[in-house]
Amino acid sequence: MGFGQANTSILSQLAAAGSVKRVFAHCLDNVNGGGIFAVGEVESPVVKTTPLVPNQVHYNVILKGIDVDGDPVDLPPSIASFGGNGGTIIDSGTTLAYLPANLYNSLLKKITTRQPVKLHMVQETFACFSFTLNTDKAFPVVNLHFEDNLKMSVYPHDYLFSLRKDLYCFGWQSGGLTNQDGSDVILLGDLVLSNKLVVYDLDNEVVGWAEHNCSSSIKVKDGSGAVFSVEANNLIASSSSSSSSLLLHFHISWRRSRGKQTCKEWTTSAYL
């Protein structure tokens, strides 16, 4: 979509023109569908942040730990020690979450120890099981801990998806991804980012998130200082300003199907 960190990205070009700050946010709703994408400084809700690793092509962050309902999961040495390239990437263009094989195995073992199930592979990719009870009540919460005490909680309805009635699969994947130096890489996609407002602040070199109802709205400030209410379906000015700046708003409509989020519709609004 052209919202990377490069100077040639859409966001960087808008910022260079003085239209907006280099800040954007998205909120993906995997419960009701839909969501929000906005360019501009987020006024509310308040979002805690963690530093971005500098001089990276991707949105790399420092993962400090993982726990399953408070029970720590051992991180691979190359992730825990943090190499120069940054071992964890935030990527909304990726559907699932990809972990080094040893971390993937440890995480699933912790989860299935708390809620025993008989796993079998589907499509040679997904670890699946039969289950008739409420998964949110039966399965544990996975917590990811990042630098500057930022936590991301991933709930069962986030990391599990249903192939059909009473058949569920884990969205966690054994990725086998590595940096050029051979160190392990964790790739966190929409599996963990959904149902959260995620803010990318390139001016301050941070990324952050807060749990949020992605079918509701957020408050965004444009380059002129005007504050707008950005809703999942429309854009309404909440301050009487005839701003000459630009505020972009994307309405996102998407669905989860067999472990894949599919973009169904994009609409954009621009205020000049």
Where are these regions (language model features)?
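C-terminal reverse transcriptase regions that engage the nucleic-acid substrate
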Residues: 2
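C-terminal catalytic lobe of pepsin-like aspartyl proteases
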Residues: 5-239, 250-254, 272
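Cleavable N-terminal signal peptides of Sec/SRP-targeted secreted and luminal proteins
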Residues: 244-251, 267
